[in-house]
A protein has these predicted regions:
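Extended hydrophobic-aromatic, low-complexity segments
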Residues: 62, 94-95
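Helical hairpin unit composed of two closely spaced alpha helices linked by a short loop
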Residues: 59-62, 66, 84-86
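Well-ordered beta-strand positions
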Residues: 22, 82-84
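Active-site ligand-binding patch in enzyme domains
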Residues: 1-60, 69-72, 125
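Short acidic amphipathic segments
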Residues: 74-82
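Small/polar glycine-rich anion-binding or flexible loop at a beta-alpha turn
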Residues: 66-73, 89-92
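Conserved histidine-centered catalytic loops in small-molecule metabolism enzymes
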Residues: 95-125
């Protein structure tokens, strides 16, 4: 699944090369051999539309990798079970801030000098 923002993604990207791909976009686009497009509605949030699409197809698992804005939308709507956050030694003074989780971490692991924090959504049980 790809969530496309205001700008179209190049069809030369690896995600469009051979495997079936679904693109959620605010623009209508014609389907191709391996790519189908789902038009996002303004009536329902993007995370809910993605989850409804997956539910209708009996897909029970989704890993969200993406920009901070996409991640924050899923987090803000409570549509997450688990988050894994790596924290390294480097600090950045500029750039896009990571999404915020207000829950305490459940566990932390040292992975080759970096730390992996695991969070569970308390609402999901």
């Amino acid at each position: 699944l790809v969530i496309q923002g205001e700008y179209s993604l190049l069809d030369t990207f690896n995600v469009f090369q051979g495997e079936p791909t679904v693109v959620f976009s605010s623009k209508q686009s014609p389907n191709t051999e391996h790519v189908s497009y789902e038009t996002l509605s303004s009536d329902l949030s993007m995370p809910n539309q993605v989850c409804n699409y997956l539910y209708d197809r009996q897909i029970q698992s989704l890993i969200v990798e993406g920009g901070a804005q996409v991640l924050q939308q899923f987090i803000s709507e409570g549509l997450w079970d688990e988050a894994r956050i790596f924290v390294g030694k480097s600090q950045f003074s500029e750039g896009i801030k990571a999404p915020l989780l207000h829950e305490p971490w459940e566990s932390v692991h040292n992975v080759e000098g970096d730390y992996l924090f695991i969070y569970k959504n308390p609402i999901q049980g």
